[in-house]
Amino acid sequence: SSAASDVYKRQEYVWEKMIDKVFGIENKADYFPKTSWWIDKTKHENASLEPDTIMISGTNVYILDAKYYKYGVTGNTRDLPESTSINKQITYGEYVATEKKFKKKHGDNMRVYNAFLMPFDSLKRKCPDNSQMLKIGEAISNWKDNSEEYQKIQGILIDVKSLMSINVRQEINEIEKLAKLIES
């Protein structure tokens, strides 16, 4: 039904906004890879690829894709992000990792990480140590050697209620917690 689809779209939008508010930097346009067509010596810009959220912790950059997927409820691998999303994250990561301007901005020791953030209910899932964030695995491709961190997209579940309770933009403790989990 289209009513159910509209509700889902609204919830997906709210999920993306909550993730961006808690973890993301405000001005992320710099991090959007751009493309263009050249036709008859005239450049025609395409719309940018736009990652949901860019998180910074120390000198590292984390490209976060908020996925309002039901894996956190079902545990079914069919409910995880597909190849198009995985490949897009790798593209974002490669762009940030290889563009000189980002090394200038974040330093030579900058590392780039990728993660999908999906909702779950920590009370229903009986998490060890009552964790509000849980790493469930990582997605990789067969067209990269997966030697770079950004080529391995981490699958992270985030407790919906605890995320909703955070009213601070760029909450530093949550950012550090998520950064550690992604890197682990």
Language-model segment annotations:
Residues 18, 22, 87-94:
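Short amphipathic alpha-helical face segments that pack within enzyme cores
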Residues 52-71:
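A glycine-rich, aromatic-flanked flexible loop/lid motif
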Residues 3-8:
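Short, small-residue-biased leader/transition segments that mark boundaries at the very start
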Residues 39-41, 62, 67-68, 77-83, ...:
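Nucleic-acid nuclease catalytic cores
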Residues 21-33, 56-60, 98-102:
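Secondary-structure boundary elements
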Residues 31-58:
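Active-site metal-binding core of divalent-cation-utilizing nuclease and nuclease-like domains
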Residues 117-184:
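Polybasic (Lys/Arg-rich)
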Residues 9-39:
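Acidic-basic catalytic patches of nuclease active cores, encompassing PD-(D/E)XK
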